[in-house]
Amino acid sequence: MTYTDLVFDLYGTLVDIHTEENDAVWEKTALYFGYYGAHYTGAALKEAFTRAMAAREARAGQSYECFPDIPFEQVMAELFRDKGVTEKADALGVNATQLFRIASTEYLRLYPGVLEALAELRSRGYRLWLLSNAQRVFTAYELRSLGLGRQLDGICLSSDYGCRKPDVRFFRVLMEERGLDVSRCLMIGNDRETDIAGAQAAGLATLYMHTNLTPPDQAAADPALAIGAAPAGNRHHEYEGSDWIRLAGLISTL
């Protein structure tokens, strides 16, 4: 077994999701703010959130992070305080963020065969890790609702660390915290830039999945780099689609 540790992206790799952060969602979130005396229109709340997030990202980028990640709930809490609502602002920020996520989510589901595939890979001796550009304030609950948490040996979410893929420091968080041998790790993700280029820069082998959530400007999987077709010893492979039962069997051949 060439690899002992499999590192997964979440959305677009294990989980199929569609969100619509449209005007109606902002209006509903603004209504929640108004319940507590923080009065915004939907458009004003969206503008204030975007401006506050950009300011925080700029400050983080100027200090040390190439790809900063700001917890959304902190920004929501700031917007409550901007309207003079200081009591329990942090808790209100959490609630507002979760409300926004729920209101904007049209569907959230595992790709077919994910749980079975993870169980099969675990039975073959692999350790399974999650490394996701995600917000703990809602992703932790989504993992629980989908039954994914119990299948994983460890979870790293970018909002906990202030940086996100493709920043090599985020990959190193997992390597260092868990004592992993980077030469025995395979990163599996659906984004050539954040997942694949970032992992390669950090020294991991990579498996690119071209799924329905891969950015539309990114190429489909190259058949010449498919598992079984790529040259022996190759540390990058590509896979078209999200058939996890089939993919688990292929991974086991590496």
Residue ranges: model-predicted function:
Residues L99-L108:
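Surface-exposed cleft-lining segments at the edges of enzyme active sites
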Residues M1-L6, I17-T19, H39-A43, A91-V94, ...:
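Asp-based, Mg2+/Mn2+-dependent phosphohydrolase catalytic module
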Residues H18-A24, G61-P68, P216-A221:
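Short, flexible/disordered intra-domain loops and linkers
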Residues L10:
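Residue immediately C-terminal to the conserved phosphorylatable aspartate in receiver
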Residues E21-F33:
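Basic, amphipathic juxtamembrane/active-site segments
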